[in-house]
C-alpha cells in the first residue's frame, strides 16, 4: 500500500453547514483549507513574484500542463530540476492535466479511446495527448499534486454523450494511475465529471473512489451553467467523496461561488479570474466589483478598497492606479493583480475563521449583501 504524499487533515467542521477547516500536507509544505490557488499558467502568476505570492498567504499555486508541455517543454523543466526550481517557488504546486486546454484552445480536436489528437494553438502542428502522456509530462514537471487526464463535456451536452464521456474518463484515470512513475512524491487526483446529471456524477464518483486516489477534483463546472445549477451539482456530488481526502472544485473563482462551495464541503479552488479582470482594471472590493479605469475615479484619492489591507490599498490611490492603466504602465496591472489575488486569498482566510466561529452562513449573508450575488455564475 502506497503512503500517499498528499494528506488531508480535518481540523473542524462548521456546526450548521458542510464546511470544513483543514490542512493539506504536501512534499513542499502544508497549507490551510479552504484555499484559493492563484493560477500560474506559464510557470508564473501574471506580473507577480513568488515573494509577493508568499506575502499574501498563498501556500500553493497552479501551473498549466498543456502550456508548459508546448513551451518550454516538460523535458527542459525536468533538466532544470523540476518546476519548483525552474520558477523559484518552494511551496506546493498543483498541475492540471492539460485536458481542458485541449478542448478549449486547440483546433480540430479528435477524441478517441486512445486520447486526443489536436492542432497546437501556437504553430498549428499536429499533437497527441493521451492519459499516459499527460501523466508523463506532469511527472517531468514534478508538481506536488497532479490531475488525471479527463474529458470535460459541456454542461448542457446530451445525456448519452456525457455517459460515454465519463466512462471513458474513468478508463483514462485507470490508465493514468498505471503510468504514474512517482506515486511516492506526487499525488494524483481523480476528476469527477457528469455535467448536471446526478446519476452520472454518482457513477463517475464511484468509479474514481474505487481507484483510491489521494484526492478528488470536481470538474465540468463554471463552464456555462447557472450558479444554482452549480450548487445543485455540488449538493449531490460532494457527499459521494471520501471525508479523509481533499476535494478540489476546478476553475471557480467568483467570491460568492467560493463561499457556496465551502458551505458544501469543498477545500480547494483555482481560477484565472482575479488576474484576468485585473488587466482590464476591474477590481474585487468589499462592495463589489470596481472598474478603476472609469473616469469617475480620475480624482479619487482613496484606496481601491478602504477595507483592504493589501500592499496596493495601503500605498496607492484609485486615481494613481487609474493613471497607470490609462498610460499602459505595467505597474498598474501589477497593483490591480496583487489586490485581486490578495482579496480572494484573504477571503478564504476570513471564511476559515467563520468556520472556527460557526457563523459561516451569517458571514455569507453579510458578504453578499455588500458584494452582490453572481446568479449567472459567469467568471468574466
UniProtKB/Swiss-Prot annotation:
Active site as annotated: 96, 270
A GO term for molecular function: metal ion binding
According to the record, the residues making up region (RNA binding) are 251-257, 275-279
Q: Name one Pfam family in it.
A: TGT
Gene3D superfamilies from the entry? Queuine tRNA-ribosyltransferase-like
What cofactors are annotated for this protein?
Answer: Zn(2+)
Q: Relay the cofactor remark from the entry.
A: Binds 1 zinc ion per subunit.
Ordered alphabetically, the record's keywords are: Glycosyltransferase, Metal-binding, Queuosine biosynthesis, Transferase, tRNA processing, Zinc
- The answer to whether keyword Transferase applies is yes
Catalysed reaction(s)?
7-aminomethyl-7-carbaguanine + guanosine(34) in tRNA = 7-aminomethyl-7-carbaguanosine(34) in tRNA + guanine
E.C. code:
2.4.2.29
Part of which pathway? tRNA modification; tRNA-queuosine biosynthesis
The keyword NAD is assigned to this record:
no
GO BP of this protein: queuosine biosynthetic process; tRNA wobble guanine modification; tRNA-guanine transglycosylation
- Residues noted as binding Zn(2+) in the record, renumbered to the chain: 308, 310, 313, 339
Q: Where does substrate bind?
A: 96-100, 150, 193, 220
Q: Name one GO cellular component term.
A: cytosol
Similarity field: Belongs to the queuine tRNA-ribosyltransferase family.
Which PANTHER family does the entry link to? QUEUINE TRNA-RIBOSYLTRANSFERASE (PTHR46499:SF1)
Which HAMAP family does the record associate with it?
Answer: Q_tRNA_Tgt
Explain the purpose of this protein: Catalyzes the base-exchange of a guanine (G) residue with the queuine precursor 7-aminomethyl-7-deazaguanine (PreQ1) at position 34 (anticodon wobble position) in tRNAs with GU(N) anticodons (tRNA-Asp, -Asn, -His and -Tyr). Catalysis occurs through a double-displacement mechanism. The nucleophile active site attacks the C1' of nucleotide 34 to detach the guanine base from the RNA, forming a covalent enzyme-RNA intermediate. The proton acceptor active site deprotonates the incoming PreQ1, allowing a nucleophilic attack on the C1' of the ribose to form the product.
Subunit comment: Homodimer. Within each dimer, one monomer is responsible for RNA recognition and catalysis, while the other monomer binds to the replacement base PreQ1.
Q: Could you tell me which NCBIfam families the record lists for this protein?
A: Q_tRNA_tgt, tgt_general
Q: What is this protein called?
A: Queuine tRNA-ribosyltransferase
Q: Which organism is it from?
A: Streptococcus thermophilus (strain CNRZ 1066)
GN (gene name): tgt
Amino acid at each position: 500500500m502506497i503512503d500517499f504524499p498528499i494528506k488531508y487533515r480535518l481540523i473542524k467542521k462548521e456546526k450548521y453547514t458542510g464546511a470544513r477547516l483543514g490542512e493539506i500536507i504536501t512534499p513542499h509544505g502544508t497549507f490551510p483549507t479552504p484555499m484559493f490557488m492563484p493560477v500560474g499558467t506559464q510557470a508564473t502568476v501574471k506580473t507577480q513574484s513568488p515573494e509577493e505570492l508568499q506575502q499574501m498567504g498563498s501556500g500553493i499555486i497552479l501551473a498549466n500542463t498543456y502550456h508548459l508541455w508546448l513551451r518550454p517543454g516538460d523535458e527542459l523543466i525536468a533538466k532544470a530540476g523540476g518546476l519548483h526550481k525552474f520558477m523559484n517557488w518552494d511551496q506546493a504546486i498543483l498541475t492540471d492535466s492539460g485536458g481542458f486546454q485541449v478542448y478549449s484552445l486547440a483546433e480540430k480536436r479528435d477524441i478517441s479511446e486512445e486520447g486526443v489528437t489536436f492542432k497546437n494553438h501556437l504553430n498549428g502542428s499536429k499533437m497527441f495527448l493521451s492519459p499516459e502522456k499527460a501523466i508523463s509530462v506532469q511527472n517531468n514537471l514534478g508538481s506536488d499534486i497532479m490531475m488525471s487526464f479527463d474529458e470535460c463535456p459541456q454542461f448542457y451536452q446530451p445525456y448519452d454523450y456525457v455517459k460515454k464521456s465519463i466512462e471513458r474518463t474513468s478508463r483514462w484515470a485507470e490508465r493514468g494511475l498505471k503510468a504514474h512513475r512517482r506515486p511516492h512524491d506526487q499525488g494524483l487526483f481523480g476528476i469527477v465529471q457528469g455535467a448536471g446529471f446526478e446519476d452520472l456524477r454518482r457513477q463517475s464518483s464511484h468509479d474514481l473512489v474505487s481507484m483510491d486516489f489521494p484526492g478528488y477534483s470536481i470538474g465540468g463546472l463554471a463552464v456555462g451553467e447557472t450558479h444554482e445549477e452549480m450548487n445543485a451539482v455540488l449538493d449531490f456530488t460532494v457527499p459521494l467523496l471520501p471525508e479523509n481526502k481533499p476535494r478540489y472544485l476546478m476553475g471557480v473563482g467568483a467570491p460568492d461561488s467560493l463561499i457556496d462551495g465551502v458551505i458544501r464541503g469543498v477545500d480547494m479552488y483555482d481560477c484565472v479570474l482575479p488576474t484576468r479582470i485585473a488587466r482590464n482594471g476591474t477590481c474585487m472590493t468589499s462592495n463589489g466589483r470596481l472598474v478603476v479605469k472609469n473616469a469617475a475615479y480620475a480624482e479619487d484619492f482613496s484606496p481601491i478598497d478602504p477595507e483592504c489591507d493589501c500592499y496596493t490599498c495601503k500605498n496607492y490611490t484609485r486615481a494613481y492606479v487609474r493613471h497607470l492603466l490609462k498610460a499602459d504602465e505595467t505597474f498598474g496591472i501589477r497593483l490591480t493583480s496583487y489586490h485581486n489575488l490578495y482579496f480572494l486569498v484573504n477571503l478564504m482566510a476570513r471564511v476559515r475563521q467563520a468556520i472556527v466561529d460557526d457563523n459561516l452562513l451569517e458571514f455569507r449573508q453579510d458578504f453578499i449583501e455588500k458584494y452582490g450575488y453572481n446568479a449567472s455564475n459567469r467568471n468574466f
